[in-house]
């Protein structure tokens, strides 16, 4: 046995699962470490902009004139994640933070696999069950995407803290109190922390006894300390703590009133809805939280990960066949926490696709349980000890002859699991969004456009670059130039109006308002008859049009009259105030004359 109580065989298998998860997450190594370090996605580039300021300037900006130019924007991202990435750079230089930011999500992703294994052990105390759970989680597409090499975003960090809290909650006695510490760290890293804390709180009511629920409630007083950073967060966690403490009192009546907790949840839901509808200023944190979950913001429907009612997207992101296999376990496994957590995380994933990251955890464990039951029924012992040399089937077949487990049986089980995981492997492949054309364009802009004092976030620069908001953080971090809009969506309305403008005069009003000197366009913004893949539809929506009520031909006709068409397709040949400055294939840079 190993020091942690695992036999060597189980430890070896866990290491193999971790190595498999590690290999999948290193898939983009060559694209990340190119001529310089690049990151995966869009938001990581603004995190690194903040990290660079921390390391080189000694402060983290709370306001930035280099986005939403020329007005600037307050930075509402919470600081802990950026300080974690900045930590090695404070001692070794910014290069250390650049490398650390690349590998950090992979490290955290691997630790999440181990945590799922540990949580599964707390659920059933069965090594095989826990190993299969860890395997499923390691290949789950959404967990891979969130922890890819170079994905320097807070998502996998938040998932790790949630899993750590859940593991501590499943521990006996006062260890449950410690679950509030990861929640505090989450509250210092992400404004949506109360959403995941609420999932854990409601699920706890259906699993633990009165005393245990009370301890979990007290643990939620620890993240109330986050009110030092943000009052909204402090009030939210205080409300969750009160919810659990009152819930522990309600648990007393469960023997007399079977559905006491259900009634209690209904009352709390009505109270929450009333707070949302009441025109009371100090309840604004409730309204903003519910609005965030419901995705009522005008920009959210145009963001891929914030789309609603993407049921197939939720199922595929959570593991395809593993999601389907998780459903029977809802009726077989006697664990209220997992069942409720699965249902709640599925519901919020339907509201916004981004929340599927927390659905992966219950899917992995529930699917593992179903698979284990299937293996039991084909005489492969999972919940029975192999050393007993006897098949202990339920019902009338308890005295059946012993089943000899051979190596080929283990190989068959492994092949079966890999077969179930094939769709996950295929869906987990995620090439870096920044193409070679973009890399060349951004580096050319950095070297050839008028220099700006990029690290002086509080000082307004002379001009801005206008592109679609998807690419704002790239232009800001790599090219070191101010932008009209970035992934915060501030300024996106003016960018959309510019690209959809039907005349040069109309477009110039935006240019003058935003002090734009350069415009960057890219092929994927345009509309082509042979494909429906375009970002022009959300551009139209944000500009105030309704493409959902237009036929494809009408959209094409509309596009052919826009500034985006006149710039990217016609290369500004028929425009007076714009000229093509540089062409990088799919990416083009225009100068305002």
Curated annotation (Swiss-Prot):
Q: Which leading EC class covers this enzyme?
A: transferase
The motif WWDYG motif: which residues? 468-472
> Key word Disulfide bond present in the record?
no
The lineage's top-level taxon is Archaea
Cytoplasmic side stretches: 1-12, 120-128, 176-180, 251-265, 332, 376-411
Per UniProt, the short sequence motif TIXE motif occupies residue numbers 302-305
The compartments listed are: Cell membrane
* Transmembrane recorded as keyword: yes
* Location of the motif DXD motif 1: 41-43
Instruction: Give the catalysed reaction(s), semicolon-separated.
Output: an archaeal dolichyl phosphooligosaccharide + [protein]-L-asparagine = an archaeal dolichyl phosphate + a glycoprotein with the oligosaccharide chain attached by N-beta-D-glycosyl linkage to a protein L-asparagine
Q: Where is this site: Important for catalytic activity?
A: 146
UniProt keywords (A-Z) are: Cell membrane, Glycosyltransferase, Magnesium, Manganese, Membrane, Metal-binding, Transferase, Transmembrane, Transmembrane helix
Outline which residue ranges sit on the Extracellular face: 34-98, 150-154, 202-229, 287-310, 354, 433-593
Motif annotated as DXD motif 2, chain positions: 153-155
Q: Where is this region: Interacts with target acceptor peptide in protein substrate?
A: 468-470
Q: In which pathway does it act?
A: Protein modification; protein glycosylation
State the Pfam families in the record: AglB_core-like (PF22627), STT3 (PF02516)
One biological process term in Gene Ontology: protein glycosylation
According to its UniProt entry, the function of this protein is described as: Oligosaccharyl transferase (OST) that catalyzes the initial transfer of a defined glycan (a GalNAc-linked heptasaccharide composed of 4 Hex, 3 dHex and a sulfate for A.fulgidus AglB-S) from the lipid carrier dolichol-monophosphate to an asparagine residue within an Asn-X-Ser/Thr consensus motif in nascent polypeptide chains, the first step in protein N-glycosylation.
Full protein name: Dolichyl-phosphooligosaccharide-protein glycotransferase 2
Q: By which gene is this protein encoded?
A: aglB2
